């Protein structure tokens, strides 16, 4: 590892330990030339797939886009920022676990809707209305009827 002070390429590891969250290894190093100490962090590289859009374009997976969409759907609902982050983290983890190089937006959208449905039904309907691009009120009503059927027709 190159010393940030003198540029020498050789060092020794003085101390090595996991970070609190277990997501990285912190290493204290000492340069063999100038003997100054510096810290490095080693972490697993997140390898997220390319997202294949409906029109066939490909772009890098962007967590921020999912956060924005979910947060918009959850506006003025009793859903905390922590719950939004947890939902998006779960979707991101699911995408990583698939191990695919490419993933369709439909897979991501369905994963988000599945989790939103259990988190907040109003947010789910809001997200679904944008994601599924309902063409008219009839399609919207069909989605609501399906939601009511799956909930056993309970009134809230």
Curated annotation (Swiss-Prot):
* Cofactor requirement: Zn(2+)
InterPro entries per the UniProt record, alphabetical:
ATP-cone_dom, NrdR-like_N, RNR_NrdR-like
**Would you tell me the protein name for this molecule?**
Transcriptional repressor NrdR
Give every ATP-cone domain span: 49-139
Question: Which biological process annotations from GO are given for this protein?
Answer: negative regulation of DNA-templated transcription
Per its UniProt record, what PANTHER family does this chain match?
TRANSCRIPTIONAL REPRESSOR NRDR (PTHR30455:SF2)
Textual note on the cofactor = Binds 1 zinc ion.
- Write down the species: Anaeromyxobacter dehalogenans (strain 2CP-C)
The organism's place on the tree of life at top rank = Bacteria
């Amino acid at each position: 590892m190159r010393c940030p002070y003198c540029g020498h390429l050789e060092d020794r590891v003085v101390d090595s330990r996991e970070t609190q969250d277990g997501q990285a290894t912190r290493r204290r190093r000492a340069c063999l030339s100038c003997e100054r100490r510096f810290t490095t962090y080693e972490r697993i590289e997140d390898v997220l797939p390319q997202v294949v859009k409906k029109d066939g374009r490909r772009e890098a997976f962007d967590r921020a886009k999912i956060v924005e969409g979910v947060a918009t759907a959850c506006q003025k609902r009793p859903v905390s920022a922590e719950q939004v982050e947890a939902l998006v983290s779960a979707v991101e983890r699911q995408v990583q676990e698939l191990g695919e190089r490419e993933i369709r937006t439909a897979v991501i959208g369905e994963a988000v809707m599945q989790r939103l449905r259990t988190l907040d039904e109003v947010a789910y309907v809001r997200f679904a209305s944008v994601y599924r691009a309902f063409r008219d009120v009839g399609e919207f009503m069909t989605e609501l009827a399906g939601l009511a059927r799956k909930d056993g027709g309970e009134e809230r």
